[in-house]
């Protein structure tokens, strides 16, 4: 059984292009792309416009330029996971934290060729794009314990082993020694 992980970051400008495979990538096997699945509620641009409108209506001012109302989670999955698994996970994350999944993608076509064996080494993962705001367009403020709980929920919903909790000051050397 694989270990679970989800890494959350502000969404990037090229997120939809990457997730929807609108650009050719050298680490993607096009012959496996038919195994990818997607779930799209709306475009990132439309959701941002809606958030900005709600924020302006509730606060009487524009949203700060540095605000990150849309965030993306990249999570490890196994070959058998489907978009329905991600929808179920998204529903649970919304119940627990109020974050709403606006897009989800399974990527089963990425990986690399082993230099030693010539064998394809897949990198099964998923991208989930979240509206990280409340009904007034204000960013949700999830703390470290919330993010730790999110890791546990990912493991539970996907039937994976919960990854080890790491401290803020974990170093790559520590990880390398554990191998």
Predicted segments with their positions:
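N-terminal nicking endonuclease/strand-transfer module with a His-rich metal-binding environment
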Residues: 1-179
């Amino acid at each position: 059984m694989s270990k679970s992980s989800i890494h959350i970051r502000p969404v990037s400008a090229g997120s939809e292009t990457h997730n929807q495979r609108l650009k050719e990538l050298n680490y993607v096997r096009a012959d496996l792309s038919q195994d990818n699945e997607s779930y799209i509620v709306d475009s990132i641009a439309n959701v941002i416009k809606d958030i900005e409108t709600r924020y302006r209506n509730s606060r009487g001012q524009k949203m700060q330029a540095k605000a990150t109302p849309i965030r993306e989670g990249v999570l490890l999955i196994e070959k058998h996971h489907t978009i329905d698994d991600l929808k179920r996970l998204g529903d649970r994350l919304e119940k627990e934290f109020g974050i709403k999944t606006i897009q989800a993608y399974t990527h089963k076509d990425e990986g690399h060729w082993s230099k030693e064996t010539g064998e394809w080494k897949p990198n099964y993962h998923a991208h989930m794009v979240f509206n990280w705001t409340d009904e007034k367009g204000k960013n949700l403020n999830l703390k470290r314990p919330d993010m730790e709980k999110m890791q546990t929920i990912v493991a539970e919903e996907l039937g994976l082993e919960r990854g080890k909790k790491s401290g803020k000051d974990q170093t790559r050397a520590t990880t390398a020694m554990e191998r």
